[in-house]
Amino acid sequence: MKKISRFALSIILLAIAGKVIIGCAPKAITKGEEFPLMYEETPLTILIMPPMNESTAADAKEYYATTVQEILSHWGYYVFPYEITADILKMEGIYDAELVRNIPTSKFREYFGADAVLFTTIKKWDLSYMVLSSTLTVSIDEELKSTKTDQTLWKYNGTVVVDLSGGNAGGGVAGLIASAVITAAQTAMADYVPYAKQANYRALTSLPFGKYHPQYLTDQSMQFIDQTPK
């Protein structure tokens, strides 16, 4: 059997490595391919439901709920004022976001005139803290459902991970102490709301634009990374 030269072996290994990298690379898809129902139904008005909270932070729902409406409006949709609709739901005895999931979406069309309903789930709203480092993670699942058919028109995940560590404060024990103090201070002052907005923005990059956006019905070929919750 002939020996394989080092050069030939290198080429083979590079080819195999290339296939592995390509296979592991995030999949890019288009809005039109992934969310065809958005272009068929073309919803104009969206009703935001109170978020479901699966994180360990009890106050996550209250903070996160303030971050959704503005970004959706910038995407070209008419969005019902969240605080008003949330109060109406409370007056109807619906205090818990989990209860909303059991209501047929057609009811929201009947009562509010909404074309679609946005359900959000807070998956992570967490601080991971160690002496010299800490990480802030905000992760949101979002799903838009039709009030005509109850079908899912769009769903996606937005996640933001922020390093709050103190960085390099010099060498030795003094440097370690300084880094620990900086990390503790930055962790204590961490504000989730801006990062929740970032998570929303990352999710909405895959949402087709609404009627009041200049690119309405022209973004079918726009690509994004597939992070749709399975």
Residue ranges of predicted features:
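Sec-dependent bacterial lipoprotein signal peptides
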Residues: 1-25
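A generic local structural motif
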Residues: 2, 32-35, 103-106
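C-terminal/domain-edge helix-coil "capping" segments
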Residues: 24-44, 147-230
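N-terminal segment of the mature soluble domain
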Residues: 43, 55-119, 151, 155, ...
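Conserved H-X4-D acyltransferase segment
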Residues: 46-52
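Buried hydrophobic packing residues in well-ordered domains
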Residues: 48, 72, 120, 142, ...
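Solvent-exposed loop/turn segments at secondary-structure junctions
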Residues: 53-56, 85-88, 123-128, 160-163
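Surface-exposed short loop/turn segments
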Residues: 97-153, 163-171, 175, 218-230
